[in-house]
């Protein structure tokens, strides 16, 4: 029986080797083929002129090459001194949609990418969580988001390039770890046409502890950010029910201590300040206790409004008071500005227009 053809861009390097072995080709060809796909971005097997004609034919019998398509572009200048924040809605070959965001900053250009279509974890402040889980993205689909943003940037200015990548878009990266790591390799170590330093890539998680432990052992130089949002177990469970119950704060702290000591890198603890929920002096003191004793820094972030979700951001005074309490205790604290709120491109707002957020445009 003839096997159905599949999209070769969905395969990781290890899977590509297996696929070549299955058609009686040596595995070492995988690197060559991978380079055609992910550096030259060949649109057809006929373009792969360094591969023999019989091999190209065999590949075309088993696979096709289909890249994601940009369906919609939005941009806003609001609150962004370094240029417009831009959001792309990307349609994947099977019709699923994800969003990806380009955020200009002083001396940097950051791509914020999605790792999953939807999300299983349903955090109460997050639009993606309202969508439910659709599926994991392949490494090619993650890599393709950076290409799409990079192409958009370079069409306007050949000299411009993406310097930083953050896995802070839709979905939980560490529930799709193998494909996220493969995408990191595509975008850094392999030195392909698009390449940045691993140190400029941040993987952001709600705290999937076994995967944090695994990441610490990979030798990757990527940075780790953890969405903490409360250092009090009950409050965290109210905000992020699934993640907080499955990976309690004590266990999470063990993983973070292990990660920081193995990698020698600080962990960033992201703390979204929510009015009347986690913004009191007592909350700050619990955070100090939690964050003391291991190599970390704290990013205070604002809540960005989401349709059907009733949290409120704190005022400037509350944010500054909270920061001062942490700083007085010796913690390294940054107030991180959010960009892209008017186009629902800021933290927690990405939902591939499934929540009706597009009505606000
Ligand atoms: S915050 Fe992250 S983990 Fe939580 S629902 Fe949103 S995408 Fe999922």
UniProtKB/Swiss-Prot annotation:
Its cofactor is [4Fe-4S] cluster. Binds 1 [4Fe-4S] cluster. The cluster is coordinated with 3 cysteines and an exchangeable S-adenosyl-L-methionine. The active site is at 99 (proton acceptor), 347 (s-methylcysteine intermediate). GO terms for molecular function: 4 iron, 4 sulfur cluster binding; metal ion binding; rRNA (adenine(2503)-C2-)-methyltransferase activity; rRNA binding; tRNA (adenine(37)-C2)-methyltransferase activity; tRNA binding. [4Fe-4S] cluster binds at residues 119, 123, 126. One of its GO terms (biological process) is tRNA methylation. Disulfide bonds join 112-347. GO terms for cellular component: cytoplasm. The keyword S-adenosyl-L-methionine applies. The keyword tRNA processing applies. SUPFAM superfamilies: Radical SAM enzymes. Reaction proceeds by a ping-pong mechanism involving intermediate methylation of a conserved cysteine residue. NCBIfam families: rRNA_mod_RlmN. This is Probable dual-specificity RNA methyltransferase RlmN.
């Amino acid at each position: 029986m003839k096997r159905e053809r599949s999209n070769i861009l969905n395969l990781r390097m290890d899977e590509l080797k297996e696929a070549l072995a299955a058609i009686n080709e040596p595995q070492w060809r995988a690197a060559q083929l991978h380079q055609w796909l992910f550096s030259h971005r060949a649109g057809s097997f006929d373009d792969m002129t360094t591969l023999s004609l019989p091999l190209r034919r065999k590949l075309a019998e088993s696979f096709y090459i289909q890249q994601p398509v940009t369906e919609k572009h939005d941009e806003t200048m609001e609150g962004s001194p370094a240029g417009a924040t831009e959001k792309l809605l990307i349609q994947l070959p099977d019709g699923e949609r994800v969003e990806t965001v380009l955020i200009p900053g002083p001396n940097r250009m950051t791509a914020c990418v999605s790792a999953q279509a939807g999300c299983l974890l349903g955090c109460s402040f997050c639009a993606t969580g309202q969508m439910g889980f659709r599926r994991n993205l392949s490494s090619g689909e993650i890599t393709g988001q950076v290409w799409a943003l990079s192409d958009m940037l370079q069409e306007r200015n050949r000299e411009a390039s993406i310097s930083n990548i953050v896995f802070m878009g839709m979905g939980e990266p560490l529930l799709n770890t193998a494909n996220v790591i493969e995408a990191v390799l595509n975008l850094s170590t392999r030195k392909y046409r698009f390449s940045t330093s691993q140190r400029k890539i941040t993987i952001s998680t709600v705290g999937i502890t076994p995967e944090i432990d695994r990441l610490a052992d990979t030798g990757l130089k990527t940075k780790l950010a953890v969405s903490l949002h409360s250092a009090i177990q009950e409050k965290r469970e109210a905000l992020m029910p699934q993640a907080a119950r499955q990976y309690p704060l004590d266990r999470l702290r063990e993983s973070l201590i292990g990660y920081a000591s193995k990698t020698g890198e600080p962990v960033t603890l992201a703390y979204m300040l929510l009015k009347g929920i986690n913004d009191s002096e007592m909350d700050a003191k619990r955070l100090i206790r939690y964050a003391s004793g291991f190599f970390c820094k704290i990013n205070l972030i604002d809540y960005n409004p989401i349709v059907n979700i009733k949290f409120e951001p704190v005022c400037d005074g509350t944010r500054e008071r909270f920061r001062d309490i942490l700083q007085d205790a010796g913690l390294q604290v940054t107030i991180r500005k959010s960009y892209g709120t008017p186009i629902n491109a800021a933290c927690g707002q990405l939902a591939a227009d499934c929540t009706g957020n597009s009505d606000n445009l």
